[in-house]
């Protein structure tokens, strides 16, 4: 069994959640959250920011760690046990552009109930739900307001 680690983000802008649509040779089709593999020497937080930017062109800011999900799948040569670390992130615009090289054909920001039903995987639904509730708590406390120093501490 191969152990693999990825990191990703639940990116929110004005209450809407960023999703990607992946279509890989008609074998894998569905809406997902942005995530990707940790590179050597990279911190999880950095990986999450980099992957969000690479897959969507969104320069996001990490707000907090949300948790992790785990799943297994059949890889090319062996079973892969993957752990994904997730972060709640904030974007400062709705602009996004899917990374075609990774077979993402669409990207967009969706209301919570739309995103919940669009997501292909239940573990991503649960992480998104947890992140959205954290966002709502911050919004209620007026702590989600974009600071003037937004451009600091974002990827890119």
Could you say what each language-model-derived stretch is?
Residues 34, 40, 148-151:
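Functional cleft and adjacent loop/helix regions within the main domain
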Residues 117, 122-156:
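Charged phosphate-binding loop/patch that engages nucleotide di/tri-phosphates or the phosphate backbone
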Residues 8, 16-18, 45, 65, ...:
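A generic structural signal for ordered secondary structure
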Residues 28, 41, 88, 130-131, ...:
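A periodicity- and composition-biased signal for non-globular, repetitive helical segments
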Residues 38-126, 155:
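Unchanged
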Residues 1-33:
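N-terminal strand-loop-strand
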